[in-house]
């Protein structure tokens, strides 16, 4: 998540502060963003103008594969110590765009539940980690670790390039070859994610999350029952599971959902 932000803070061919936000103001784009998940980071954009399309592709490719990743950007986007308060009340606090963002996200009980569930279901794979960043752990990341992670993972051998529209695919490939691929050699990044080993018996886990002082702890417990099912590439099993989910809990009249609500075991 920190790397997703930091690569957009200047690159080899665009050594300006925040070229991403500069393009937001100047471009004819209909969409520009960046997303991070447990096993991928995506830099999507869209525009209806051919010239703008290649301008945006130029900025995005250079940002992803040849970013500056300077220390000031790391401190801005990741974490740093700031002085706050005055006089005897002065103190040091952690700040940073991603750090503050994730502090806000992880203050939500629902987010804590989702992250805890993934941690419990996938204890032996990358999916156990909070890809956004755990606020308590973010300050342990170093600038050198961030650069090393980029060198290993942000490589064409570990990337997919997706294009859509009525522009020439041949032109797209020639552009990507000239800007990026011609400067790299193929490697094995070793980023395959193994399947989570299956358990022989069910497991129960307990996680904690903070409450406001005014909240009643007796009314703030959350419960979740989950199963590790088919491989995501097994499209038939995934479809069947989605249908079953809709039948059982898809709306207020669904039998399982209605039974749980009528039981008054808790509140939704």
Outline where the language-model segments fall.
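Charge-rich, well-structured scaffold segments of protease-associated domains
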Residues: 6-201, 206, 213-240, 246-268
């Amino acid at each position: 998540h920190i790397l997703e932000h930091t690569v957009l803070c200047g690159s080899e061919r665009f050594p300006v502060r925040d070229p991403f936000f500069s393009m937001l103001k100047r471009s004819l784009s209909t969409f520009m963003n960046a997303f991070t998940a447990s096993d991928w980071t995506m830099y999507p954009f869209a525009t209806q103008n051919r010239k703008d399309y290649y301008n945006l592709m130029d900025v995005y490719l250079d940002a992803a594969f040849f970013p500056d990743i300077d220390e000031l950007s790391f401190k801005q986007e990741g974490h740093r110590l700031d002085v706050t308060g005055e006089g005897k009340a002065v103190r040091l606090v952690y700040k940073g765009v991603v750090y503050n963002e994730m502090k806000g996200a992880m203050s939500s009980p629902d987010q804590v539940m989702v992250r805890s569930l993934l941690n419990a279901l996938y204890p032996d794979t990358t999916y156990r980690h909070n890809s956004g960043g755990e606020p308590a752990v973010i300050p342990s990341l170093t600038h050198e670790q961030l650069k090393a992670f980029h060198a290993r993972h942000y490589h064409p051998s570990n990337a997919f390039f997706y294009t859509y529209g009525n522009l020439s695919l041949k032109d797209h490939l020639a552009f990507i070859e000239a800007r990026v691929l011609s400067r790299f050699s193929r490697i094995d990044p070793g980023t395959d994610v193994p399947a989570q080993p299956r358990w022989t018996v069910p497991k129960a886990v307990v996680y904690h999350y903070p409450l406001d002082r005014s909240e009643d702890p007796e009314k703030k417990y959350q419960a979740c029952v989950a199963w590790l099912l088919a491989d995501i590439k097994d499209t038939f099993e995934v479809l069947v599971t989605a249908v079953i989910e809709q039948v059982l809990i898809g709306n207020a009249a669904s039998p399982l959902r209605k039974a749980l609500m009528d039981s008054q075991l808790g509140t939704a």
